[in-house]
């Protein structure tokens, strides 16, 4: 009988947390600019790496997203793998994280109700803008490998940077944030595979200028036995 003192429990796998990220492109259809920032060197997740604005879904996102307008085709694509309530929360988290990490508001002239006033609501109201959630297209999904201690189930959205006014600023999450040509970002910056994956998917749609399509399959990046898998869902 083995000595119990020698038995070692296998580490518990981290459950991937829901997260949202926005690929903001602007300008040229062939070689647009993309918004990227470098994660702090002391960050727990992907330190020193250039990424899009984004982060995990908060509990409050569910309440704030309850009545937001969402394109039918975007909702249809998200609902293939998550319930409607979570799909809406992901979209709200996407615009919230973009503002928190860059200072940019994905919006257009309009009003927003201050009654449930989060900091994001107040930022929109002060700028005379309303959230432009209809401007987001769901383009890709990536799940952090199972062996990682910190994992995310991230949905990537594409938005036009021309619809994201505001003054860029460094935050506690992202440093050296700014607009860069996609070609330069790919060749010169330290990008993770997942960032390159989402950027390539965004660039395809940006160049095609394809109309909304609820039947379009969405690329998903995941791993199995440490082998990267790219599938359509």
Predicted stretch roles:
Residues 1-11, 17, 43, 73-80, ...:
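Nudix hydrolase/Nudix homology domain
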Residues 47, 54, 59, 106, ...:
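Generic structural "secondary-structure junction" signal
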Residues 52-54, 60-132:
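The catalytic Nudix box helix
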Residues 21, 36, 49, 156-158, ...:
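Conserved hydrophobic/aromatic beta-strand scaffold that supports enzyme active sites
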Residues 26-29, 40-41, 55-57, 108-109, ...:
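Short loop segments at secondary-structure junctions
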Residues 12-34, 43-67:
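Conserved N-terminal beta-strand and adjoining loop/helix that marks the start
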